[in-house]
Structure formats: structure tokens, C-alpha cells
Amino acid sequence: MQSLIVKNVMCLSVFLILTACNSTVVLHPPEYKVPILQTDDHYKYAVLNWEKTSNIEVNANTWWEIFQDPILSQLMQQLNQENLSLKQAEARYQQANALLEKQHANRLPSLKLNGSAQHSGTKGSTPNNRFTAGVQVSWIPDLWGRVAKAIEGQQANLDASQADLAAVKLNQQLLGTETYWNIRVLDAQLDVLQQTQHSYQRSVKILNNQYVAGMSARADVIQAETQLKQVQIQQIETQRERDLQENILAVVQGKTVAQFQLPKQKQYFQVPILPSQLPSRMLIQRPDVIRAERELAATHAQLGLAQTAWLPDLSIGLTGELNSHVLSQLFQAPQYLWSTGLQTTALIFDGGKRKAEIAQAQASYTEKAAAYRQAVLTGWKEVEDALIQSSSFKQQQSEQFELFKIALENEQVVTRRYNAGLVSYLEVITAQNLRLQAEQATLQLKQLQLKNTAQLIAALGGNIS
């Protein structure tokens, strides 16, 4: 009778398990493929010739060398080694790699060792020493591909973490490059202001001498002194901005403000010319786009993993134990105990929990798919923005240069007319201010062009080779 009951229970268990395995709720998502997006073959605002390329991998490069500035190259090398944001991203990558190794370990059986020692007895009796040693082996075969899906998902997470590392690196390099050129343009502005200050000081001295000699009005002296003070105030403001930019560059280098100093440098900087053929491969080489695609792949694997919740769990176990009474049974053979077993578990009813988890995974996949498309569109926009600015700055450069030449000539003409007694010194001051404003605007435009070049390269993924 008891044997019949056991058989009936076993048959019922098998039936329920098979019912769970064949449930129509178990869905099998299609194999993951990278979404194909419809993109243009050219950029709307491209002045250069652009070509579309095939898939390539993100690789480390030294894109800043296009500026041909040895100090900038040295700073970028320091940044790559000491930047703390980059170190954080590297640590996150190592964490993702460790999680992948953890998932691979789930394919293998686990081995546990256990032991115990006991010393017992009663009053007037011989103490009893007992030692026990055992081993336990368990293994969960990957019948439904759960471990494989988990590994697939974590591999995608690792790839996303690697892309995130590349994105952080590129962003920090861009920040360092932009800050460096901000400082260099401020150096040039300080040089212009210093030369202007010396010129204005000479004018004040000459006008004072003329005023003392009765050859000039006091109003001319006051106007010249006011103009000199304005330039000195601009020097203070410009120096303050340079100090703040230097502080930013110090942090990017992984140093304290006190540990870092960038000497002033008077130099002529030229906006680099990009290669005539630049591929429109930012869709596949931009780190943020790669990260979004890999996150989508990880979510797809998570969706497949959620589907396996309808399938039963199966585990195989083997245990062995050595039991010996060391003192009281010293000359007797120890006792060996062993057992092996097969265990299966199937969840029949959970109140809709598994359906909800699958729905959540599907919604998450939809979200990541939209995020991937958004990353691609954002990439295109950033390139188009940089191209618009590049073209506009180039047109503005020629006009600005003409304006500076006119302002310089006007200053020279008005100065000669003042020396000839034909105009007041107020006109000289006006002409000098126009020349100074034009020269400063020319430098600021150079600054915008240098930063735009770096931004365009970064928008293309940091690789223009």
C-alpha cells in the first residue's frame, strides 16, 4: 500500500513538472541582433567630404596630437594615467569583469568540506573524543540555458562598462583640451592687455607733461587715465579667469590646485585643418552609442532569463562522511557514510509573479531600445552642431580679420590727426578701444575654433584616422 502511494506521488510530481515545462506562457525571445537604424549617408552641414564606413572597434588614440602642441600632449598623457574619474570608470569595469567570472563559475559543481570535533563524557567515565569529516558535492545542470543567458547578459554588461570607460576617458580628454585652449587664449589676451597698458601709460605720461606745459587740457589727462584704469581692470578679470581655468585643469590631471601650475606662454596658435575625408562612423564608434547598444543586449538576455522562471529547477547532490571515535575506538575501523540524490522543484502557482517579471523585462527592453535610438540621434545632432559652428566660425574669421585691420588702421589715422591738432583726444580713445575690442574678439574667435575642433573630433568618437 505504501509503495503504491509513493508511486502515485512520483507520477503526480512528474506530471506537474512536465505541465510547467510545456506551459504556453513560456516564451522564447528571438536571438538578439543589433538594431538596424535608418541613417543618412551624409551630414547636412558638412563642408568636407564624408564617407560611410563599416563596423569598427573603439580603440585608444591620441586625437589631440592634431593640434601639434607638445605641452598639450604631455598633459593628456598625465590625464590618462592620473584622472580620478577615469580611475572610477576603470574600477567599475573591473567589477563587471568579476561579475562575469562569477557567472561562469555557476557552470561548475560546488564542493564543500565540513568537519567537527566533540569531547564528551560523564562523571566517573572515560572521556569520549569524536571527530567527523565530510564532503558535499552539488551541481545544477544548465538544462534550460539559464546560466548561459546570465553569462550572455553579464558579457553585454561588461562590454557596456568598457564602452562607459571609453566615454569617460573621451569626455575627460575633451574637458582637458578645452580648458587648455581656454588658458592659452587667456594668456594671449593678457599679453595684448599688457602691451595696451604700456601704451596707455606712455600716453598718460605724455599728456601729463603736455598739461603741465599748458599744451593739453586736463580733460585729456582724465580720459587717458580712465582708459588706463579700464585696461588694468580687464587684466585683473582676465587673470582671475585664467586662475580658475588652471584649477579645472589641475583637477582633470588628478592633482590639487597647489600641486599644479601651467606656465604662461606667448604663442601663435593655429586652428588645425581636419583631413579632407572624415568617415561618418560615429554611429558605431562613439562610446556612448556602443554603451547603449550593449545595455540593450544585456536587457534582451535578462528577458530570456525571465522566461525560464516557468521551468523547474534540477539539482544533483553527493555527500560523504567519515566518522571515527578516536580514543574509545582507536583500533576500530572508522565509519563511512555516503548518500546521493536528485532533486527537482517546479513552481506551479505564484499569483502572476512570473508574468509580471516577464512584462517588466519586456518593458525594460523597450526602454533600452529607445535609449539606443536616442543615443544615435544625439550623436548625429552633436556632429551636425559642430559642423554648423565650424562653417560659421570660418566665415566669421575672415570678416573678423578684416574688422581688426580696419580698426588698427583707424587707430593709426586718428592718432596722426590728433598729433596734427585736428581732433580731440576723445577720438583717439574711441579708436584705441575699437582696436582693442577687435583684437580681443579675434582671439576669442580663435578660442571658439580650437574648442570646436576638439568637440567635432569627440562627436565622431575621438578617432579621425
Could you say what each language-model-derived stretch is?
Residues S85-E90, Q94-L100, H104, L193, ...:
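Long, contiguous alpha-helical "rod/stalk" segments
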Residues Y211-M215, Y418-L422, A459-N463:
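A short glycine-centered flexible hinge/capping loop motif at secondary-structure junctions
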Residues S3-Q81, Q239-I284, V326, A458-S465:
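Terminal intrinsically disordered/low-complexity segments used for targeting and assembly
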Residues L75, E82, A89, I140, ...:
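Amphipathic alpha-helical coiled-coil segments and their boundaries
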Residues T344, A361, K368, S390-F393, ...:
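Hydrophobic, well-ordered secondary-structure elements that form the walls
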Residues A98, A105, A163, L170, ...:
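Regular, well-ordered alpha-helical segments
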Residues V147, A163-L278, Q389, V413, ...:
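Periplasmic alpha-helical coiled-coil/stalk elements that build and connect Gram-negative outer-membrane
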Residues T62, Q68-I71, L75-Q78, K87-E90, ...:
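Small/polar-residue-enriched beta-strand and adjacent coil segments characteristic
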